[in-house]
């Protein structure tokens, strides 16, 4: 047993060596934990641009548990704590935290990063050995990304059930087990993400046919395990995009709404395929009340009794400058009534949250001019508390109209609110102020723009609720006291609706910006203003999504590839040229549709045709001329610029293939043609095989001719040395000139 800072590291059950390791990267992570303070981890992540560093040191990892209703008195057991990515969330809320992990190196990383905590103890060793020595009873036992390894922890016929039975022995009577795990049926896996643990496509959704040792589960499968382990009551939450980096956590009491699930950048660690547009599929799933079955991850709280908490929904906005990091919760009381609260995630953001109340009070009379109403807000000790309102957002309504094909109606509705914003914020001449420049930069906007004070720049469709007889503005966090151009607020309304979801692109060719009076020059300037605002909001913080292109192996857009290949097939034509005495000319040709597999067609032959040329276009693998005949006249003679592969097959090496028929019979009326496209790989292989064979045959012929030549030369040389040849040379006339001279 030893201490790192204030942290107790108990190695009583440690076997002397780590049974699993990620290698040298763990040494690097240990150095980071030793030498870098937690408030600088984000800077290191930005510098390293490494998946392991991001995964183990990102503050977003703590979002999965930092919302839990800890009172500061709870005793928590964290099983499989690893490098401590989630441990900090427990230390921030609970009274005592005990960690168990098999790896000494990872436990040291955990200890170093939390060395200032006086309420952390880490037990290093195999779980089955360590748990036998546990004497405490715990309020919470957490399994964050651990339960799926039950087969490795427990050697039994039913390891996952037995795992929970063993854990249960260490719970207080009213204690809870908290499990975060991937959903085997998570939509991201159907859409082309690889299985998280094995890195293979579709392994989980097919039931793990090729792998062993790790298993994730569906809702039904987990409920069955919970029941068999002792009749646990379960409360379900759904972290999005997943439990590893959750920015929103839904529950059965507050499921996602249409348009909310539009983030697909999950794959920081592995290449993924993109088989379909997930946001559109999510909307369809939501329409059919199937979201829990297809959520990417689960966060399940189980116990002898139901987990009681008012929190029904959690949204983190903590990828910002610490001054602006907040948490939004929807809470439900036992009587069913709801309220919303916004909390600072740290002391530096307290002023920002308090400011929300002040802005709401100031905006109320302004918005009422356009029959918009601010949901009531009050200051409380922990932040602000807001009224919970029912209805659908303007964003949802617009999406519904698009789904129904009512594009004109959607445009008209959108412009109703654009005009409201223009009237609200177009009352005075705009002029850049120092405060404006601090937030939006020196924009260089054209003269003559109108603007307004108390500018709620987040007056976007997602934040406008269409209620019964009243429209409500739900979020006015980003409201500024200085003058902002009305067109910029309108630009953001359009931009954040049109650009945040691919299914809304059907409106993009309607020139909505121009119709709203926002010139192209303004659009370019507003885009730069928005970038400057985002920099102001995040400060020196490096958001995880900004690193996607540098860390992630990326996506393969299968639909784009499919459309391209299908398009090639749809556009492929057989062009037939007829030479009627003026050679082949474009005006004397016809085009016939041709599929990727080929074609079978009867081609009428115009009178007077002397020659024909058939151009099938690019055929990567070449083709087989299965049939080429004159009707009633027999097989048609032809030649081609392709390489003959045998059996009427020809390869063109990616060139422009041509089939030429010379001497077309005068009586020819119909040419029957059947082409069959060859598979490229097979054709290329056969081409090189035949090419090599022909080259070898030619080389052999050349060598044979050289040998014959050498033999003839030897024969000549031998003949020249005979007496007869020498006598002949003496008697042979010297030539015509010599003979003539003698005759003279």
Describe the function of each predicted region:
Residues 158-176:
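A short glycine-rich, Lys/Arg-flanked "PGG" loop and its adjoining helix->strand segment in the class I
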Residues 207-208, 438-505:
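Catalytic activation segment of kinase domains across protein kinase-like and atypical kinase folds
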Residues 323-362:
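ATP-binding glycine-rich loop module of kinase domains
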Residues 178-201:
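Conserved class I S-adenosyl-L-methionine
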Residues 1-36:
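N-terminal auxiliary segments of SAM/dcSAM-dependent transferases
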Residues 83-94:
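Conserved SAM-binding loop of SAM-dependent methyltransferases across substrates and taxa
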Residues 549-568, 674-744:
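Boundary detector for helix-to-coil junctions that initiate low-complexity/charged tails
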Residues 374-438:
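Conserved structural core of kinase catalytic domains
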């Amino acid at each position: 047993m030893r201490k790192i800072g204030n942290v107790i590291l108990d190695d009583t059950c440690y076997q002397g060596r780590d049974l699993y390791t990620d290698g040298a990267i763990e040494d690097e992570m240990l150095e980071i934990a030793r030498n870098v303070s937690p408030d600088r981890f984000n800077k290191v992540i930005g510098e390293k641009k490494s998946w392991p560093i991001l995964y183990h040191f990102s503050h977003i990892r703590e979002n999965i548990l930092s919302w839990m209703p800890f009172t500061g008195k709870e005793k928590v057991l964290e099983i499989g704590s690893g490098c401590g990515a989630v441990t900090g969330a427990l230390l921030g809320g609970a009274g005592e935290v005990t960690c168990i992990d098999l790896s000494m190196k990872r436990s040291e990383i955990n200890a170093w990063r939390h060395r200032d905590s006086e309420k952390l103890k880490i037990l290093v060793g195999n779980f089955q050995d360590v748990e036998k020595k546990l004497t405490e009873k715990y309020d919470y036992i957490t399994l964050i990304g651990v339960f799926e390894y039950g087969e490795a922890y427990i050697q039994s016929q039913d390891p996952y059930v037995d795992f929970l039975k063993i854990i249960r022995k260490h719970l207080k009577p009213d204690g809870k087990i908290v499990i975060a795990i991937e959903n085997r049926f998570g939509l991201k896996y159907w859409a082309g993400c690889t299985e998280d643990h094995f890195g293979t496509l579709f392994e989980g959704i097919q039931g793990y046919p090729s792998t062993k040792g790790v298993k994730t589960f569906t809702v039904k499968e987990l409920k069955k395990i919970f029941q068999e382990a002792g009749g646990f009551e379960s409360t379900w939450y759904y972290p999005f995009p997943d439990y590893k980096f959750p920015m929103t956590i839904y529950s059965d009491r507050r499921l996602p709404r249409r348009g909310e699930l539009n983030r697909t950048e999950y794959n920081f660690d592995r290449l993924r395929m993109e088989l379909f547009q997930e946001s559109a599929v999510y909307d369809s799933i939501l329409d059919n009340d199937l979201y829990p079955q297809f959520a990417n991850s689960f966060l399940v709280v189980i116990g002898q009794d139901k987990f009681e908490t008012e929190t029904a929904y959690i949204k983190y906005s903590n990828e910002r400058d610490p001054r602006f990091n907040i948490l939004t919760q929807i809470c439900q009381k036992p009587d069913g009534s709801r309220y919303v609260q916004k909390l600072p995630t740290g002391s530096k953001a307290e002023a920002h949250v308090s400011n929300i109340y002040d802005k709401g009070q100031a905006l109320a009379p302004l918005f009422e001019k356009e029959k918009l109403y601010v949901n009531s807000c009050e200051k409380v000790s922990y932040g602000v508390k807001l009224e919970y309102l029912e209805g659908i957002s303007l964003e949802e309504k617009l999406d519904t109209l698009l789904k129904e094909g009512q594009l004109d109606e959607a445009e008209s509705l959108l412009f109703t609110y654009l005009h409201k914003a223009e009237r609200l914020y177009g009352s005075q001449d705009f002029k850049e102020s120092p405060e404006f420049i601090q937030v939006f930069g020196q924009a260089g906007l054209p003269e003559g723009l109108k603007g307004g004070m108390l500018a709620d720049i987040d007056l976007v469709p997602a934040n406008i609720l269409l209620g019964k007889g009243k429209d409500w503005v739900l979020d006015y966090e980003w409201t500024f006291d200085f003058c902002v151009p009305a067109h910029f607020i309108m630009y953001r309304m359009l931009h954040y609706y049109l650009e945040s979801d691919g299914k809304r692109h059907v409106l993009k060719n309607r020139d909505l910006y121009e119709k709203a009076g926002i010139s192209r020059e303004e659009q370019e300037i507003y885009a730069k203003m928005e970038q400057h605002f985002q920099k102001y909001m995040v400060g020196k913080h490096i958001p995880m999504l900004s690193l996607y292109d540098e860390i992630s192996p990326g996506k393969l857009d299968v639909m784009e590839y499919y459309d391209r290949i299908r398009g090639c097939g749809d556009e492929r034509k057989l062009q037939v040229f007829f030479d009627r005495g003026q050679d082949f000319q474009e005006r004397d040709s016809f085009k016939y549709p041709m599929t990727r597999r080929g074609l079978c067609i009867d081609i009428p032959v115009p009178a007077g045709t002397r020659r024909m040329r058939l151009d099938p276009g690019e055929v990567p693998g070449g083709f087989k001329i299965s049939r080429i005949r004159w009707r009633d006249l027999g097989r048609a003679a032809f030649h081609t610029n392709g390489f003959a592969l045998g059996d009427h097959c020809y390869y063109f090496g990616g060139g422009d293939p041509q089939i030429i028929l010379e001497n077309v019979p005068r009586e020819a009326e119909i040419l029957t043609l059947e082409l069959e496209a060859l598979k490229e790989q097979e054709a290329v292989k056969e081409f090189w095989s035949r090419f090599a064979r022909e080259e070898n045959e030619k080389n052999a012929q050349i060598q044979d001719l050289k040998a014959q030549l050498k033999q003839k030369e030897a024969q000549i040389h031998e003949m020249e040395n005979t007496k007869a040849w020498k006598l002949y040379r003496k008697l042979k006339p010297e030539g015509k000139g010599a003979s003539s001279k003698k005759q003279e």
